From Swiss-Prot:
Region span, Disordered: 1-21
Descriptive protein name: Ribosome maturation factor RimM
UniProt comment concerning the protein's domains: The PRC barrel domain binds ribosomal protein uS19.
Location of the protein in the cell: Cytoplasm
Residue ranges annotated for the PRC barrel domain, each copy included: 111-184
InterPro entries, alphabetized: PRC_barrel-like_sf, PRC_RimM, RimM, RimM_N, RimM_N_sf, Transl_B-barrel_sf
Family matches, as HAMAP family: Ribosome_mat_RimM
GO cellular component: cytoplasm; ribosome
Cytoplasm in keyword set: yes
Family (UniProt): Belongs to the RimM family.
Keyword Cytoplasm tagged: yes
Entry keyword set: Chaperone, Cytoplasm, Ribosome biogenesis, rRNA processing
Residue ranges, compositional bias (Polar residues): 1-17
Lineage: Bacteria, Bacillati, Cyanobacteriota, Cyanophyceae, Synechococcales
Species in which this protein is naturally found: Synechococcus sp. (strain CC9311)
C-alpha cells in the first residue's frame, strides 16, 4: 500500500465519501494474490485494473493499484492482485482490510433500483403496521444477501433479502417492509 493522497474530492476521514465494495479475507497462493469477499454487485470493481483504496480498521484509506482480478469458479469470492504485493507475507498483512471506491464512482441505476448498501439505516416495518420494529444495521453479501436488523428489543436478527420476505423498499421515505415467515424474527 502506498500513502498516496486520496482524490481531492474525497475526504479520507469521512466515511460518507467512500463506498465499501469488499473485504480482503485471505492470501491466495505464494505470489501475493488475495481473496476478496465482495459487497458489490458490480464485478468490474474486482476485475478491471485501476485505482482502489484499502482501509484497515481505524486507519485512513490508502491508495492501491489493482492489477488484475478474477472470480473463483462456483464461488462468490474473487482473487485479486495488487501492485507491490508480491508474496504471501505481504498479502497476509492486508487481510481484513476493506476495499473502497470513492462514493462519487457509484454506477448509475435505473429508476426503482438502489444500491444494497443504501439499505443500512432504514427502518424495518412489518406488513400491516407503520411502526418500525428495528433498523437495518448491516448487509451480509453471499449467495443470498442477508439484512442484519437490530430490533427495538435490542436483539439482532438476520433476514434474507429476497422479494418474498422484503417485498417493498422505500429509500426516499427511509423504510422497508418485512413479511417474514413465522419464527424468523425469533431465531
Amino acid at each position: 500500500m502506498t500513502s498516496t493522497p486520496s482524490p481531492s474530492t474525497a475526504d479520507p476521514n469521512s466515511t460518507n465519501d467512500w463506498l465499501p465494495v469488499g473485504t480482503l479475507v485471505g492470501a491466495q497462493g505464494l505470489k501475493g494474490e488475495l481473496r476478496l469477499n465482495p459487497a458489490s454487485d458490480f464485478p468490474e470493481r474486482f476485475t478491471e485494473p485501476g485505482t482502489r483504496w484499502l482501509q484497515a480498521k481505524g486507519s485512513a484509506p490508502k491508495e492501491v493499484e489493482l492489477l488484475e482480478g478474477r472470480q473463483l469458479p462456483g464461488k462468490s469470492l474473487y482473487v485479486v492482485r495488487l501492485k507491490g504485493v508480491n508474496n504471501r507475507a505481504s498479502a497476509e498483512a492486508l487481510v481484513g482490510c476493506t476495499v473502497l471506491v470513492p462514493a462519487k464512482d457509484r454506477p448509475e441505476l435505473a429508476e426503482g433500483e438502489f444500491h444494497l448498501l443504501d439499505l443500512v439505516g432504514l427502518e424495518a416495518r412489518l406488513a400491516g403496521s407503520d411502526e418500525p420494529i428495528g433498523t437495518v444495521s448491516n448487509l451480509i453479501s453471499g449467495g443470498n444477501d442477508l439484512l442484519e436488523i437490530k430490533l427495538n428489543s435490542g436483539k439482532t436478527v438476520l433476514v434474507p433479502f429476497v422479494e418474498a420476505i422484503v417485498p417493498d423498499v422505500q429509500l426516499e421515505e427511509g423504510w422497508l417492509l418485512l413479511t417474514p415467515p413465522p419464527g424468523l424474527l425469533e431465531l
